Amino acid sequence: MSFQMKYDIRLRFEVEGIVEKTDVIGAIFGQTENLFGDEFDLRELQDKGRLGRIIVEVKTKGGKSEGEIIIPSNLDRIETALIAAMVESVDKVGPYNSKFELIEIEDIRAEKLKKIIERAKGILSSWSKEKSLDIKEVINEISSAVKVGEITEYGPERLPAGPDVDKDPNLIIVEGRADVINLLRYGYKNVIAVEGATSRIPETLINLSKMKKTVIAFLDGDHGGDLILKELLSNNVKIDFVARAPIGREVEELTGKEIAKALSNMMPLTQYLKKVQEAEQAIAKNVIAKEEKPIQSETTQQVVQITLPQNILEEIKKLPGTLEGVLYDNNWNLIEKVQVRDIIPKLEAYEDNKVAYIIFDGVITQRLLDLASQKNIKMIIGARIGGINKRPQNVDILTFTDIISS
């Protein structure tokens, strides 16, 4: 789901040593993590579109580094101010002492808001001439209409939910708060989120599911969705049907038509699990990785012969189910191990030609491919390939299945 940003947080910084952009970004993420819980985790906020990409400009002079940072924010004023204060608290970049100071928080909507206000005044003025207007009555009507679709909190765990989770005989289970908001937007009010649980499913949800006539698990079309379903079942949550977003897509970003299509294509749980098991068995029959074995990556124009070192083949076999990725240089030397959700911001921060190969337990998307092409990355090996409209000529892409079945 994409949001229009409301504010630009602008800060200046000084570091008592020579550092790069990646060092500054790493310090910001590392030193603000868990300060105020997951709700204000910068990576989570970026994943949900509530914060934009952190822009860093660095200059070095006399053995020191200084520069400016811009953090686009779609949070409210109080939350945006809190993010600014969190970043100001960063006092180390790498081994060096540092100082971060807020320059300003710019309201990038200000001019647009002024025009809207002036236009609203004109509309109200002309409307008043035509008909006597009780403005309090209008406000009350609008307020009542909005409250119908407002998100609620359910149970002692305060799970994000729609207003009808108690009274509707059917229940839709999704992963997170953003998924609930999106379904509410299109009129689905019997929805509740597990809030991304991957080790402990809330007891409230387990009990609620057993009270319902029909329970649908509606999950993202990626490996994360697979893990959530596994946890739901292992915690004895009643699931009757499984619906999935298209491969590589998230429930929170689907349109009304896409949501309706996904739900209409839902499968009974037993049928869905049988389908998954058959797919896993087909892959398991071919789990053989030979040392230095050439792997073919086919495109519509050519067949590229690729040789993978034995240690890379071993690494690929370890990755499924970890939601992790590995970045390598041109000689297959390890650069960094990262979480799948951090791959794009990490690549954005690296200089061109720094990373040559990426192996990760995730979906290869158009956005990742475009960025890889821009950064001159040679090859990406992922768990699956998502909806790709255009394949860059300079990037080879493979899946784990391509490797282990060769």
Swiss-Prot record:
Catalytic activity: ssDNA + n NTP = ssDNA/pppN(pN)n-1 hybrid + (n-1) diphosphate
Swiss-Prot/TrEMBL GO biological process terms: DNA replication, synthesis of primer
Binding-site residues for Mg(2+) 1, renumbered to this chain: 175, 220
Summary of subunit composition and partner proteins: Forms a ternary complex with MCM helicase and DNA. Component of the archaeal exosome complex. Interacts with Csl4 but not with Rrp4.
Name of the protein described by the UniProt record: DNA primase DnaG
Molecular function via GO: DNA-directed RNA polymerase activity; metal ion binding; poly(A) binding
Record flagged with keyword Acyltransferase: no
Effect of substituting residue 220 to A: Decreases binding affinity to DNA and primase activity
Lineage, opening ranks: Archaea, Thermoproteota, Thermoprotei, Sulfolobales, Sulfolobaceae
Domain Toprim intervals: 169-247
Stretches that traverse the bilayer: none
Binding site for Mg(2+) 2: 220, 222
InterPro entries: DnaG_primase (IPR050219), Primase_DnaG_arc (IPR020607), TOPRIM_DnaG/twinkle (IPR034154), TOPRIM_dom (IPR006171)
Cofactor details (free text): Binds two Mg(2+) per subunit.
